[in-house]
Regions:
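Positively charged n-region of N-terminal signal peptides that target proteins for export
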Residues: 1-4
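Primarily secretory-pathway and cell-envelope proteins
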Residues: 22-105, 119, 147-169
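Sec-dependent N-terminal signal peptides
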Residues: 6-13
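C-terminal motif of bacterial Sec signal peptides marking the signal peptidase cleavage site
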Residues: 16-20
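Short, solvent-exposed, Trp/other aromatic-anchored flexible loops in extracytoplasmic proteins
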Residues: 105-143, 147-152
Length: 169
């Protein structure tokens, strides 16, 4: 049984690693300190459907938001097993539309290859510092997006996306 669980975890970690790799960085985000915002220069969201995994929620823990990071609470009130990793993406709301916050580093980057199990009834906190990737965020309305797997077995899972909104004052 332990060997099967180890194989399942190895397969999921590989999937998370491949999904967490991103292409080359973009220019610094219009709207970071000292720059102006222009939605024409930004990439619109790819995540039109979020928070569609019934019984699984992600919220921002009160009092943890800063221009450099925050803490999320991820809760599984369903009867399914879930897995999530280190991957996240930030978006900013401009003119009632969501746009990706471009990364501030050049070249390729990735996220730690790890999978966190979120069993039915579990509630976990996940802390992140995005300064290495996005820099310090300017004032505005943002959301953080994380992928989460509805995991049934090796090769048998569905990927969903959770989003939690927050404001930098």
């Amino acid at each position: 049984m332990r060997k099967i669980l180890a194989l399942i975890m190895a397969a999921l970690l590989s999937i998370v690693a491949l999904g967490g790799c991103m292409n080359k960085g973009a220019t610094p985000f219009d709207g970071t300190k000292g720059e102006t915002e222009n939605a024409n220069d930004l990439v619109p969201t790819k995540y039109e459907t979020v928070n569609d995994l019934e019984g699984v929620t992600m919220t921002v823990k009160g009092g943890t938001v800063s221009p450099n990071g925050l803490t999320l609470t991820i809760e599984n009130n369903s009867d399914i097993n879930c897995l999530y990793g280190q991957f996240f993406l930030l978006e900013k709301k401009l003119d009632d539309k969501w746009y990706e916050v471009p990364v501030t580093i050049e070249g390729d980057y990735g996220f730690e290859d790890i999978g966190y199990e979120l069993a039915p009834g579990d509630k976990q906190e996940w802390e992140t510092d995005w300064q290495w990737l996005y820099g310090s965020l300017d004032k505005g309305r943002y959301r953080i997006i994380k992928d989460i797997l509805d995991f049934r077995g090796t090769g048998d899972f569905d990927t969903h996306y959770l989003a939690a909104e927050f404001t930098i004052d």
